[in-house]
Swiss-Prot record:
Cell location: Cytoplasm
One of the GO biological process terms: keto-3-deoxy-D-manno-octulosonic acid biosynthetic process
Annotated GO MF terms: 3-deoxy-8-phosphooctulonate synthase activity
Enzymatic reactions: D-arabinose 5-phosphate + phosphoenolpyruvate + H2O = 3-deoxy-alpha-D-manno-2-octulosonate-8-phosphate + phosphate
Signal peptide limits: none
Keywords linked to the UniProt accession: Cytoplasm, Lipopolysaccharide biosynthesis, Transferase
EC number: 2.5.1.55
Pathway the protein contributes to: Carbohydrate biosynthesis; 3-deoxy-D-manno-octulosonate biosynthesis; 3-deoxy-D-manno-octulosonate from D-ribulose 5-phosphate: step 2/3; Bacterial outer membrane biogenesis; lipopolysaccharide biosynthesis
Enzyme class: transferase
Pfam families linked: DAHP_synth_1 (PF00793)
Ranges annotated as spanning the membrane: none
Protein name in the entry: 2-dehydro-3-deoxyphosphooctonate aldolase
A cellular component annotation (GO) from this entry: cytoplasm
Amino acid sequence: MFQPNTIVKVGNIVFSNETPFSLIVGPCQMESRDHAFEMAGRIKTITDQIGIGFVYKSSYDKANRTSLGAARGIGLEKAMAIFSDIKKEFGCPVLTDVHTEEQCAAVGSVVDVLQIPAFLCRQTDLLVAAAKTGRVINIKKGQFLAPWDMENVLKKVTQSGNPHVMLCERGTSFGYNRLISDMRSLPILRSFGAPVIFDATHSVQEPGGQGDSSGGQRQFVEVLARAAVSVGVAGIFLETHQDPDNAPSDGPNMVKIDHLQRLLETLMEFDYLSKKVN
């Protein structure tokens, strides 16, 4: 049986609970090649200036949208070509979600990190198929799970022969259309040995809160992210966009890219103090 790696390397980016945090960042949905390149380019400029490593993220298919008519993305085939070009152009690793076992091999042939969505985190066949790609696996904790329940989820991947796993906290259901972030979950998740990621933007989501779409409270992203890095995490997950209010999905949660650098600089200061004390 494999134990999870306490240090996970994605290209030249290191995720460890004991070292300065790294970043998973990008728009919620892949909208077009031009938009993906614009976002990746701006993110690279910002992260180069402040000295933090990043993995570029985006979703080719938002398979769990609130309503049938909601925009879902550009699809797997187009997205893989764009991800491949982003890796070459900007020299950054990339991450995207998988929703079925059949998608794992195709996505794993291009993408560096396969992400298991929160709603699917207990789907054994999906976890095993993702594990067998040999890629790094980032598992979102289901909103319906206690943090200690994630140990068995983690073992499904490691016992399939893949120790390259990260666990991601993204909030817990707290009544209807509400999530709450319990920071006690972070040390609990850390105790399983894998790097822990905090998803600061989905944690402020209001699932289905706008009737036919999800709402959110982006004004609390920084509050929760500060708390998470103060506890100590391996990485911060942030979705960003140049115009969140007009984004095709998760706009109410996303950080405007014009505000990204200041936010990251603040988080890096909190992270430094946290890791120095610990």
